[in-house]
Every structure is written in C-alpha cells, then in structure tokens.
C-alpha cells in the first residue's frame, strides 16, 4: 500500500460488502454495489490496474433461520439466492472480476489458515461466557436466534448487532432481556466455552491504522470511540450447525462466527481471480500478503465497525496487509422516508427493470445523487427530473445534435483543423477535476464534472451557431464538439457503461469505451462516423404519476396486511404517532424572519460527561464553526454524525448547559429527535427560508 495519489504503480483490489442471501435485492443494496463498480471502472480510467471482487455471505444465522422456515437446507437456499444475485448484478452492469461465495473451498481453506495463524501468534484463547439458551427448544441461541435490548443505547436489537439503534456489534451474552426467535419465549443465559480473538493485542496497531486509513469521514471517525475507549475481545465461534467448523483444538462442536469467514472472502475471491488469469498476470499474494497493492472496501455504513476494527485486526494477526481505504455508503430513503421492506416502501431491482427503465439510469442516479457517505433520497419524480435534465437534456441532447450536424456536413470529424486551445483547456481541466475527485473518493463530483462538460458543449455549440456558418468556419466548431462528445463518453463510462458504449460506437471508435483511459479524452476522434440515434428518452409526468400510484398502492396493501396480523413487524414503523396540536396563535412574517435559520454541517459530536441526554456538537455554519449543545446523546450514534447536514437556529442567545456554552440550536422532530436535514446538498451557511 502507498500513500500516493491514484493511479499508483501497484494494483488495486476494490471489494463490496457481501450480501446475505436472505431476500431479493432492492435499490438500497444496489447503491453499494453500483458505487463499488463505478469506482472500480473510474480507477481503471485513470490507468490504475484494478480488480473488483465480492461474494455471497452463505453462513450464519440469517440464512439458517430462513432455511428452516422454507423447509430446505441452508446451502441449497444460499446457492439459489447466490445465482439470483449474480444475475441481478449482471443486469445492472456490476461487473465483478470474481463473485464467489463463502462456502467455496478457497474461502474455507483460507479461513482455516487465518485461524491457524492467529493461534500460532497467540491471539486466540478460550473462556467461559454467558450464552443465550432456549430451554423449550433445547437449543443454544446464537446471533439472530435471539433478540432483546441493546445494552448501549436501549433500542431493540438482534443478538449480534444493534441494527435499529447505535449500530454496535454485540458479543454473545451482552443483549438484555433476551427472547428466543424460535419459540418467542424468554431465553436463559448459560455458561459455555468459546474462542476469542484477542483484539486487545491490536490496540496500538488500530490507533495507528485509523489515522492512516483513507475513505469516507464516517468510516474514519465512527471507530475512534470504540478503539480509543479500549477494545473488547472478539468471540469468533458460535453454537450452530451451519458454518465453517472451528479448525483448532477444543472447538469440535463449534463453527466460526460468520464475521470471521465473510471478509476473508475478499481474499478468496482475489485468489480465485489470480488462479484464473495466472499469477504472472495478477498475483493475489503480493497485494494481500506483501502489501504491494491498494485495498479499498466499499460497504454500507451499518458494517463500519466490522471493517475498521475486526477486519484490520484479523489481517494483522495473520500477517496480511491492511486496507488503504474504507468507503461507507449512506442509506437510501424512499420519498424522504426510510426504506422499509416489510412495509414494501422499497424499489426492488426486478421491479425497476419491469418498469422498463434502462439499468444505467438508476446506476447514474444512485452513484451521483450524493456523496458516498450521505443518504440518497429516491423518488420517481426526482429520478425523472435528473434523467430528463442531466442525461436527456445535457448529455443526450449535446451528443445527438453535435454528431448529427458533424455527420451531415462533414461525414464525421472535420479534418484539416485542430482542437482549439480553449476547448482543449476545458477538457484538460475536466480530466484534472475528475482525477482529483476520485482521489477524494468522491464519485458524485466525478460524475457531475462529466455532465458539466456536456453542458459546456451545449453552450458552446449554441453560442457558435455552426448552422449559420459556412463550411470552413463551422469546421473548427464541430471539431471541438466531437472531441467534447468523446471526452464525455470516456468520463461517464463508469456510471453509464452500456449507454456510453452506444455513444462510443456512434463516434465510429474501434474497440470499447470500457478499455479507454482518461488520456483518450484528448485523442482525436475518427474521421468518419454514421448518423447517430438519441441516447435517452425523457420520462413524462404521466409516467411518474403512474409509478407513484403503484408505489402508494403496494405500501397500502402491505399496511393492510400488517393490520390483519399477517405482515411482519416493521423496523421503521411510523403509524400511531400522537401528534401535538397545532399552535393556536399565528405569527407574522416579520416574526418568522427574525429567525436566522442556517444549514450547518456537524464537524464533531461527543457526549457531555455527567449528562444523560446532552451532546456537544461542533457545527460548521459557513461563517464559522459553532459549539452547540443538543439533547440527542441517547437518540443518535454520535460517531456517525460528522458530515451530517442539519438546520441550525443561528441567532439564539448563548446559554450554558452542564457547564458547556451553547451558541445555537439544532432543529429536530419528535421524541426521537429526528434531525432536520436538507433534501439536496446545500452548503454550510446557506440561509433556510
């Protein structure tokens, strides 16, 4: 691993978090995989040798529980879903170099080697712990076989993770008020011998690693409290029939915890790729063992702890190389509300395709709607608006009018004229901005820069009006325009892989745009090409209305089913809220204007010692960074707040709470202190009207 900018001389391995084979894929899943794919393609554009891998997470309690319910074996169910996922990824042009699964022999053998190395290096020990047990079912209750209350934040939690609250990993025996998911009865805690990875051995290492690690701010900031607060050792075994048997002594009736073998699949998938192409072409060991490579993990933000605490320790304990970067994507909301599979407030991958839209349109939307770490809001109206204005009007309109005019008047690219200095400078600047954005792990800006180049082209052709010029005067204008189209095709390829191949062919280029690098943006286009076709169709308002009505109908159907007692409990239920009555006294517009509401960005968040509910926030409001006290300590994961855009009352009188001065107020809704955020990315300091 180096600290040089991309592209480096060493190869890169980009990974995506492994999906559990427990249900169909929706756009919340696709956001991570599309982002990982687009980033991999973009690195290749820079000339960075890149391998892109992932796989299906076959083991653990989620698949075991579903297999029992379906009356099939977990392997059969897992393999069926694995094939479905592979097909879906292919449909959306998520092109893994290897997409394996954790039950393959390569991963099983590597996992055994990892555990053996930990034992050889004295990082593993056995101890008695409290484990949940269901006396009625006569069964141990690992992970998702038990639910209860998170001991850290008090939210409802699964046995191994506080998925609804603070997102912490939970060790066996930690969950309070345990309930068996098998019988619904209260569980008991019994002592049981289990194996632990001694994370405390890696305390000093992790403190250094988290400072070296690149990636998104949430991935870099969230683990600091866990690491700096002292690490608890990691239970690596479970009482379960499904999984990889513990390979060492004293673990005959135990399997490895799913979060042991799951990330090792990154290594296994890379090794499988290396074996397929030959080690002379790509040597997996030089990257993963020798450190001669750039390892980049693209994950959902709910598994940050696993990838910034557990996984680096696992690698270090087996003498493997560390990751260079962890990029954690935010969630996807639907119409401004949390995606909920049980309420069917979701857009499923198959449902999107059935609606007749090209996969590239959703790829572009998900990869460029916000920065990596921020939540994306999906609505059919916003989807249509972005397709129509950014793709159809900006990219498609420019490409079509430029290539059509060039074809009809010059049979292709005008010859005997050179690219003008101004346009060459504009393209070169776009290339530099694109490269800078990727080195900041900023896909959104990279995509925006490509679309901005198309907008520049539209303005350029409109300003120069080649249709009003004679052939000699029009030639340099169209030479510039065709070059701009080529540059746009190259830069947008990571986001629109199929559509840009079509555009590349319309340009008369040989080969594929996927093989082009950023340097090709300034290489002369072919002298001849045919008449183009339009790349994008606009989405009409009537179609948006149809889609909105269909979404509302399926949500209503799921709600009715739930009311009848047939649906699942919803983790994001929002029914039955008792609203506060509206204020009886009106205020004047002048009174409202007295409030100075500003967009702010949380820079730092920490609990106030001695206060149950109060947190100290450092909030950037554009003009300055303000210290603000907010009653959100128990209601939000403070480590995840940096980078969040909030609305601040900037002209509140200063006050002092628990000895801490507060210079403003952060607006939040309801008893859960739901922080008010901006729909788009308004800059800190923007006035809220």
UniProtKB/Swiss-Prot annotation:
Keywords in alphabetical order: Aminoacyl-tRNA synthetase, ATP-binding, Cytoplasm, Ligase, Metal-binding, Nucleotide-binding, Protein biosynthesis, RNA-binding, tRNA-binding, Zinc
Subcellular location: Cytoplasm
Protein name: Methionine--tRNA ligase
Primary location: cytoplasm
EC number: 6.1.1.10
Transferase in keyword set: no
Cofactor, free-text remark: Binds 1 zinc ion per subunit.
Described purpose of this protein according to its UniProt entry: Is required not only for elongation of protein synthesis but also for the initiation of all mRNA translation through initiator tRNA(fMet) aminoacylation.
Residues that hold ATP according to the record: 341
Assembly description: Homodimer.
PANTHER family, alphabetized: METHIONINE--TRNA LIGASE, METHIONINE--TRNA LIGASE, CYTOPLASMIC
UniProt cofactor(s): Zn(2+)
């Amino acid at each position: 691993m180096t600290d040089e900018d991309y592209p480096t001389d060493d190869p890169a391995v980009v990974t995506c978090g492994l999906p559990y084979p427990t249900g169909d894929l929706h756009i919340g899943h696709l956001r991570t995989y599309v982002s990982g794919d687009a980033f991999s393609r973009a690195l290749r554009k820079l000339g960075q040798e890149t391998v892109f891998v992932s796989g299906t997470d076959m083991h653990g309690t989620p698949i075991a529980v579903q297999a029992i319910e379906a009356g099939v074996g977990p392997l059969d169910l897992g393999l069926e879903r694995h094939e479905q996922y592979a097909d879906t990824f292919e449909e959306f042009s998520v092109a893994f170099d290897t997409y394996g699964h954790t039950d393959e022999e390569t991963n099983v053998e590597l996992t055994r080697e990892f555990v053996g190395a930990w034992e050889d290096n004295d990082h593993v020990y056995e101890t008695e712990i409290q484990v949940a047990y269901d006396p009625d079912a006569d069964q141990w209750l690992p992970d998702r076989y038990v639910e209860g209350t998170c001991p850290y934040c008090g939210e409802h939690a699964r046995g191994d993770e506080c998925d609804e609250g603070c997102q912490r990993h939970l060790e066996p025996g930690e969950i309070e008020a345990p309930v068996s998911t098998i019988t619904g009865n209260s569980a008991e805690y019994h002592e049981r011998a289990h194996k632990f990875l001694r994370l405390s051995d890696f305390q000093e290492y992790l403190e250094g690693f988290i400072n070296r690690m690149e990636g998104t701010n949430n991935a870099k900031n969230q683990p600091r409290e866990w690491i700096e607060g002292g690490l608890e050792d990691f239970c690596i075994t479970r009482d379960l029939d499904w999984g990889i048997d513990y390979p060492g002594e004293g673990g005959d009736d135990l399997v490895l915890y799913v979060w042991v073998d799951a990330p090792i699949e990154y290594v296994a998938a890379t090794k499988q790729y290396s074996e397929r192409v030959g080690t002379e072409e790509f040597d997996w060991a030089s990257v993963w063992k020798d450190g001669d490579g750039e390892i980049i993990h693209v994950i959902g933000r709910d598994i940050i702890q696993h990838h910034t605490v557990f996984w680096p320790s696992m690698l270090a304990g087996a003498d493997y190389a560390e990751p260079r970067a962890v990029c954690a994507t935010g969630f996807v909301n639907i119409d401004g509300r949390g995606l909920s599979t049980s309420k069917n407030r979701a857009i499923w991958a198959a449902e999107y395709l059935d609606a007749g839209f090209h996969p590239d349109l959703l790829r572009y939307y998900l990869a460029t709607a916000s920065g990596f770490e921020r939540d994306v809001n999906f609505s059919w109206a916003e989807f249509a608006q972005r397709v129509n204005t950014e793709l159809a009007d900006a990219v498609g309109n420019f490409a079509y009018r430029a290539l059509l005019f060039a074809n009809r008047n010059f049979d292709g690219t005008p010859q005997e004229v050179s690219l003008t200095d101004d346009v060459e400078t504009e393209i070169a600047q776009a290339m530099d901005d694109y490269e800078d954005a990727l080195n900041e792990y900023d896909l959104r800006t990279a995509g925006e820069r490509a679309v901005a180049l198309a907008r520049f082209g539209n303005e350029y052709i409109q300003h120069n009006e080649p249709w009003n010029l004679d052939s000699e005067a029009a030639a340099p204008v169209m030479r510039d325009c065709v070059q701009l189209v080529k540059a746009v095709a190259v830069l947008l390829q990571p986001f629109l892989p199929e559509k840009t191949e079509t555009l590349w062919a319309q340009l008369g280029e040989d080969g594929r745009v996927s093989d082009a690098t950023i340097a090709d943006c300034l290489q002369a286009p072919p002298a001849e090409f045919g008449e183009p076709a339009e790349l994008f169709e606009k989405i009409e308002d009537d179609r948006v209305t149809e889609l909105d009505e269909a979404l509302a109908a399926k949500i209503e159907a799921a709600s009715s089913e739930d009311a009848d007692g047939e649906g699942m409990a919803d983790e994001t239920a929002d029914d039955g809220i008792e609203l506060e009555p509206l204020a009886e006294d009106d205020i004047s517009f002048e009174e409202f204007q007295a409030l100075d509401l500003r967009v702010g960005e949380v820079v730092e968040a920490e609990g106030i010692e001695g206060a149950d509910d109060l947190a100290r926030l450092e909030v950037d409001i554009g003009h300055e960074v303000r210290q603000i006290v907010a009653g959100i300590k128990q209601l939000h994961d403070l480590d995840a707040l940096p980078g969040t855009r909030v609305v601040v009352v900037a002209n509140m009188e200063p006050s002092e709470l628990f000895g801490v001065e507060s210079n403003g107020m952060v607006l939040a809704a309801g008893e859960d202190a739901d922080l008010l955020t901006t729909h788009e990315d308004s800059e800190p300091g923007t006035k809220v009207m």
